Structures are given as C-alpha cells and as structure tokens.
C-alpha cells in the first residue's frame, strides 16, 4: 500500500512536470510544507473518490478558481489488459468534452485510470496510468485541449465499481473516470 501511495505521488509530480512550460525570464517559486498523510486505506484511495480533492488539485495546478466538479464514471471502458481506446470509448469521451469545448468554458479535466483486480497490483497501477494517458492523448489530439488543463493518474485496482469475481464486474472496473472541474 505504501508503495502504491508513493508511486501515485511520484507519477503525479512527473505528469505535472511534463505539462510545465519554459520561460525566458526568472521563474518564481513558492515554498510550502507537504502535509503529513496517514497511511490508511482511505488516504490511498482518496484521490480517486473525493470530488473536493479533484477541485483542489485543479486549482493548485492551474492557479484558477473553479466552482464545482462533475464525475463521469463507467462510460469510458477498456478491453482486458488494454489501454487502446475503442470507438465506444471515444464516443463517450466526445459526449463529455465536445459540449465543454464548444461552449468555450474554463474547465479542467481529471482522468482517473482504473483496472480490475486480475494481475499484480504494480502492473495494474501502470495499466491504469496508461489508460488515463490514452484518454488524455485522445482529448489533446482531437480537441487541442492544452495538457496543462488535464491531470491523469492511476487508481489501479483500488476503487472498483463492481465485484471482481464475475467477468461482467471485472469489465465494469476497467475504465477511466472523467472528472470535469468548472
């Protein structure tokens, strides 16, 4: 569990670092103290469950003010052991993103990659991250949404929406949750 928490933190920092921009002038930095996080199951899965945390992350990453978050869970699904977007998954993404782009709203997208519980936890974590990145890449290529207006990370197998004992339940757990922050 501690390894998963550390991996989530490191990969989040890497994604934030990749979306930064270069500057010709001096860069201003802010100093802050990292809060101490208790190592409980709730603390580990909290990034994948709490819309208030999604809203706070978006404001921290963009320095903008947002007023609410809406979660779309279960529409963007994946085949077993895959992060390739199907035609159905692309349609589901389009249904969420196209109206936002057309309305020219200020919004931020959080993409949470999930897996079923089949396989090793570390492998599932990477697969969830690859799924979030696939959705992020599609949105960037299809709509030109700047990468700094998106954040993608993995929840791995930690937040199932269905029972993993049955094939149908495992299929429902292979997904990316889209959180729209406006």
Regions found by a protein language model. Give the residues of each.
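A short, structure-level motif marking secondary-structure boundaries and short turns
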Residues: 3, 82, 120-122
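Bacterial N-terminal signal peptides that target proteins for export
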Residues: 1-8
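Periplasmic peptidoglycan-binding/tethering modules of Gram-negative envelope proteins
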Residues: 22-108
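C-terminal motif of bacterial Sec signal peptides marking the signal peptidase cleavage site
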Residues: 17-20
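Periplasmic OmpA-like peptidoglycan-binding domain that tethers envelope proteins to the cell wall
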Residues: 114-182
């Amino acid at each position: 569990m501690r390894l998963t928490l550390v991996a989530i933190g490191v990969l989040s920092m890497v994604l934030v670092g990749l979306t930064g921009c270069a500057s010709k002038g001096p860069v201003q930095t802010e100093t802050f103290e990292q809060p101490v996080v208790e190592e409980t199951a709730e603390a580990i899965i909290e990034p994948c469950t709490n819309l208030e945390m999604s809203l706070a992350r978006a404001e921290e990453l963009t320095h903008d003010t947002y007023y609410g978050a809406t979660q779309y869970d279960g529409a963007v699904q994946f085949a077993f052991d895959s992060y390739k977007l199907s035609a159905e998954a692309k349609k589901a993404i389009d249904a969420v993103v196209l109206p936002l782009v057309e309305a020219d709203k200020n919004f931020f997208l959080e993409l949470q990659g999930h897996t079923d519980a089949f396989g090793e936890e570390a492998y599932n974590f990477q697969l969830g991250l690859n799924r979030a990145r696939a959705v992020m890449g599609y949105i960037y290529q299809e709509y030109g949404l700047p990468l700094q207006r998106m954040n993608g990370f993995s929840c791995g197998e930690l937040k199932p929406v269905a029972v993993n004992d049955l094939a149908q339940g495992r299929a429902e757990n292979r997904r990316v949750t889209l959180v729209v922050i406006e």
